[in-house]
From Swiss-Prot:
The active site is at C364 (nucleophile). Keywords: Methyltransferase, S-adenosyl-L-methionine, Transferase. This is Uncharacterized RNA methyltransferase TT_C0988. InterPro entries: MeTrfase_TrmA_AS, NA-bd_OB-fold, SAM-dependent_MTases_sf, U5_MeTrfase_fam. It is an enzyme of class 2 (transferase). It comes from Thermus thermophilus (strain ATCC BAA-163 / DSM 7039 / HB27). It comes from the Bacteria. Belongs to the class I-like SAM-binding methyltransferase superfamily. RNA M5U methyltransferase family. S-adenosyl-L-methionine binds at Q246, Y273, E294, D337.
Length: 406
């Protein structure tokens, strides 16, 4: 057993410590804490996943949190740590000392999530699946859930549904919740689904479990509504239980508001990894033509619904791989909001060949963002603006809004 003090927070929700055995990454540990445990080596590094905390950080959050909350610190103390993660990535990975605007806090530190997914526990109730494990962590409540999802959580704890998982998607705008039932037999779930709608759920769908990921298999409506409207700052957009939409709409709305003020406007704009096209629809009044590229059929379907509802005739959705953007030609603005892996080499190469006047880069991973920004700066761009945003309080995750210009 080793006893050691944690030095700093690093990406992934780990505290870093230097010991006689080498660097140890400690899950959920906070800077300055004294911990004890037996680190295990995996992927070439030492990890301690369940430390015994001997001396806690004075700001450690005292109330129970779900396992996903890997930054259990008083909220005001979380923000400088997250800002430091972005600054460190910018300096260490991108090799840049560009100014960083102060982090924008989440409007709500708790009760902010409008989407969540839980496993059904064999003993009843709902549980989190622990990462890289088959272990289930049973929950009595989840303080990260916004209303009305907190109501839905309490209802579902008492329903013995024959499913593997339940997924929730709510709307702060409408005050409603959609429910996804994952696994089980859809025919046997039709009657419970109708009863759940009578109980207060806006709609229920069934989803086939898939090794490819969440809602990658067959999805069948069972009862009630299929979509809801949610407000993301100045924009109202469609969400569904199977959609990949921002789970903190108040924070996402603030980012959209600021993004709109950063760009020049012009003739043509392109959004890669568009999802349902929030940026395309938001910026459509500033450009003559806007093209939204997205690979997900469901996201494109919702984007088209919103485009028609908003009357955005100059927006065009294309269901295609972002790596094939070369075929679309030149644009004044390219918006990119890639997954955590960042931009693939094909997209970075396209940007450096097409040379749009502006690149609006939104990231959910500071390290891959910094890698891509460094490559674009070496290719002739300058980082004109960057600001961290906190979409996920009580977790290590941090978003970045940035603008590059020629």
């Amino acid at each position: 057993m080793l006893t050691f003090r944690v030095e700093k927070l690093v990406p992934g929700g780990y505290g870093l410590a230097r010991t006689e055995r080498g660097v140890v990454l400690v899950k959920g540990a906070l800077p300055g804490e004294l911990v004890r445990g037996e680190p295990k080596r995996k992927k070439g590094a030492l990890f301690l996943e369940a430390p015994e905390i001997l001396e806690a950080h004075p700001g450690r959050y005292p109330e129970p949190l779900p396992p996903s909350a890997d930054l259990p610190l008083a909220y005001e103390a979380q923000l400088p740590l997250k800002e430091a993660l972005v600054r460190d990535a910018l300096e260490r990975v991108a090799k840049l000392e560009a100014p960083l605007a102060p982090i924008r806090p989440s409007p709500r530190p708790l009760a902010y999530r409008t989407a969540a997914q839980y496993a059904r526990h064999p003993l009843g109730g709902l549980a989190y699946r622990l990462p890289e494990s088959h272990e289930l962590h049973r929950l009595e409540k989840d303080p990260l859930l916004a209303e009305p999802l907190a109501w839905a959580f309490d209802v579902l704890k008492l329903w013995p549904l024959p499913v593997e998982e339940v997924a929730l998607r709510g709307s702060l705008l409408e005050g409603k919740v959609l429910l996804g039932l994952v696994g089980g037999v859809p025919e046997a779930l039709k009657r419970p689904a109708k009863a759940l709608v009578q109980e207060g759920f806006a709609g229920v769908v069934w989803a086939e479990p898939s090794p490819k990921g969440r809602f990658r298999g067959r999805v069948t409506p069972l009862a009630g509504e299929r979509t809801l409207l949610e407000a993301f700052g100045p924009l109202k957009a469609t969400v569904s239980v199977e959609s990949f939409s921002q789970v903190n709409p108040l924070a996402a709305g603030a980012l959209l508001e600021e993004a709109r003020t950063l760009v020049f406007g012009g003739r043509r704009a392109l959004e890669l990894y568009a999802g349902s096209g929030l940026f395309s629809l938001l910026l459509s009044p500033r450009y003559e033509e806007v093209v939204a590229v997205e690979i997900s059929k469901e996201a494109v379907r919702r984007g088209e619904m919103d485009r028609k509802r908003l009357g955005a005739e100059n927006v065009r959705f294309l269901r295609m791989d972002a790596r094939k953007a070369e075929a679309l030609g030149a644009f004044d603005l390219v918006v990119v909001d890639p997954p955590r892996a960042g931009l693939p080499p094909e997209v970075r190469a396209y940007l450096l060949r097409a040379r749009p006047r502006e690149i609006l880069y939104v990231s959910c991973d500071p390290a891959t963002w910094a890698r891509d920004v460094g490559a674009l700066v070496q290719g002739g761009y300058r980082l004109a603006f960057a600001r961290p945003y906190d979409f996920f309080p009580f977790t290590h995750h941090v978003e970045v809004l940035s603008l590059l210009r020629l």
